[in-house]
Amino acid sequence: VEFVTARAPDISVSCGFLEHMLRILTFHGQLDLKIHAYGDTEVDCHHLVEDVGICFGQALREALGDKRGIARYGSLAPMDDALSMVVVDLSGRPYLHFNVPMPCAKAGDFDTELVEEFMRALANHGQLTLHIDLLHGSNTHHIIESVFKSLALALRQAVARDTNVDADTDAGTGANAGSGGKSSGRTARQIPSTKGVL
């Protein structure tokens, strides 16, 4: 994974619906994603979807590096009748909240419950916090597409450069904390958090 805008993604997955969603994710998130994945889809897509989520999460975590200078937080995206909200925090703390009722158990040949499995694998192995809610929608395909669009936009916002991230804060952090208040600036690998420095 690279955060660029000009390259076409290199995606080949033996689950057509998942490949479609990954292409939506890379387009709207402006990600350069290379992924080739094949599995026992003659049984079902469960293992493949979960493994792709794991690999994408790990690649995302590595691409973010120390996360210094990024906005960190990221969105709403419609697809016709469907409107989804995805809020991401590149915090280093894996968590998934997934509230997306699916009207149908299948979208074509794709088991719709696997969307949650993909997101859980992404959150756990990307070490990020994800809150995903469907605000409204009736078409299952549109609902899933709006979720992936929202995820793409949330990631795009969260990885954007933010010059304010390097600014001093009112409270000391990391090695500077407890040093008599002489310095309140963040050091190079520090990410501010309500639970301390990440």
Whereabouts are the PLM-identified features?
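Structural preference for solvent-exposed beta-strand-turn elements
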Residues: 1-174, 178-198
